[in-house]
Structures are given as C-alpha cells and as structure tokens.
Amino acid sequence: MERRFGLASGKEETLEAIGKSYSITRERVRQIENDAMRRLKRPNTLGEARQIFSSLAKHLDDHGGVSEEQKLFNSLADGRLHNHVNFLMALADGVTRSGEDDKYHHRWYTKKEAREAAEQIIERTIDKLAESKKPITRERLFGIMKDNARSLMGDSPSEDSLDSYLATSKLIKQN
C-alpha cells in the first residue's frame, strides 16, 4: 500500500512496477491490494480515522457533494500530502472516486445522485453555451448553471458547489 499510494516516496507506483520487484504479476498485486484495502476497512481497524472520513465527506458535501480530484486535494492539504489524502479517501466509507473520461476529470463524490445532478447541470450548461458560441463572463456562466440547477433540482446550489461542478468538466474552460 505504501508503494502503490506513494506514502513514503511521494510517487505512486504502478501495479506492474510493484509486481516486477516481487516477481509476481500485476494481477496478483491487484489482488493483494484489494485484500489489504478490505482488511483496512474493517470497523475495528480504523478506529479514530472514522472522524477524518466523516470530515472528508462533510467537506465534499459542503461543495455540492462532488469535487474534481486535484481541486479537492488542494483544498485539503499541501501538494506533498496529496498521496496521503488519496489513500485516506480510498479508505473512507461514503465517498467514491469516479474515473476520468472525455468529458470529466477524476472526481470524488458522496452520493451517486449528487454526481449525476452535477453532470446534468454541466451538460445543460454546455448545450446553452453551444447555442451562443461566444465567451461569457463568470457571473453569466454561474447564472446559467443556477437556472439549470433550479430546473433539475428545484433550488440553486451555492457558489462553492457550482465552482466545484465546473472544475469537474473538461469541456468548459475559464480564462
């Protein structure tokens, strides 16, 4: 786990690199990693770390329940500790990592519904921006996002939440 998450060196290692050093396959390393995570997640193993996990979830909830990974890590710790934050997030119950794709950066969320709502708000905002094909101010962008949120969720998220949603998108850039 130390090498996989880069807890000592600050540099994460691939399954393949770890496997080569032990002369085992990367699939075997994956199995060992999964077993170690399962064991670490046992209720009697983590004890005092539960408070940290609930604080991480609350931090995410305070930002709309969704946050782009680097933005989240930067808001929680100095860069040299990001690997440790990543490890804690991976252990935490109630938070889930969503992988990167063509539209979105790596992101963490507390509830599937929050992630889906954020994605719908972003997608509707992209559609609206495509209609005008012109740059707009940040205030106007947030206005569009608030309108989309109201039509989807019935109310408007906070500025922090909208900023968090915006950071997840690869398709909307800010100048």
Predicted regions and their residues:
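C-terminal non-catalytic scaffold/interaction domains in large multidomain proteins
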Residues: 2-175
